[in-house]
Amino acid sequence: MSTLRKTLKDNRWACWLVLACLVVPMFASYFFDDMFSSLSELFKNPEYLELGWNMADYGFYASGYSFLCIWGGLIVCGALLDRFGVRLVGSIFVGLMVGGAGLVTFAISAGFEPKTSLTIAYIGCMLFGLGSEIAGVSVTRSIAKWFKGRNMALAMGLQLAIARFGTATAILIAPMIVKQKALGEFYTLAETNKPALIGLAVLAVGAILWAVFVAMVGWLD
């Protein structure tokens, strides 16, 4: 059994399988983060949104992504990652990323008053942002370990390219999901929350693949 594990760990195809498991959570993270960027015009007329947010509200919500990161969250969590390893800490923060996205989706779907939904969504965005950034560090560290001495730069480049494709996908398909209406027509929550629901579903797939990665690494180690 130990010989089989060593053979798989040294097999270059195992490395690419690991990469395949790692890139999906990052793709999903970038997609969810940018899902409203091409829909920002909607917030210019909050009176036509059941959500009720204006441009300032949307800007406030989006700023939540960086709040915990710039106040030492990345440093503290990076130290925890060094201390306890990718499998434990990375899993916690992938979970935090998905949980934060779930809280955002709940906030913009439940029919709260605008200020209440904004507050809940902001908290969710803070958790999502910190989870996403530490998950990204975990992915980079895992790639460095698995591709040590072989195709490391290529693997990191592919990971980043696929993650950025999440941004491009969000920008391209969000206007198709929430179709623009004539000025004066009303947008319901069921319409404006569609990008978040899709993003949350992709994040859930990413979390499952992260779990596959953790299980595989645990077995091979």
Q: Where would I find each of the regions flagged by the language model?
A:
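Small-residue-rich segments within alpha-helical transmembrane domains of MFS-like 12-TM solute carriers
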Residues: 30, 34, 129-137, 168
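Cytoplasmic helix-loop-helix junction between adjacent transmembrane helices
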Residues: 124-161
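Extracytoplasmic
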Residues: 17-45, 53-55
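C-terminal ends and interior cores of transmembrane alpha-helices
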Residues: 95-114
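Symmetry-related core transmembrane helices of the 12-TM Major Facilitator Superfamily/SLC fold
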Residues: 193-214
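Glycine-rich segments within core transmembrane alpha-helices of 12-TM secondary carriers
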Residues: 153-179
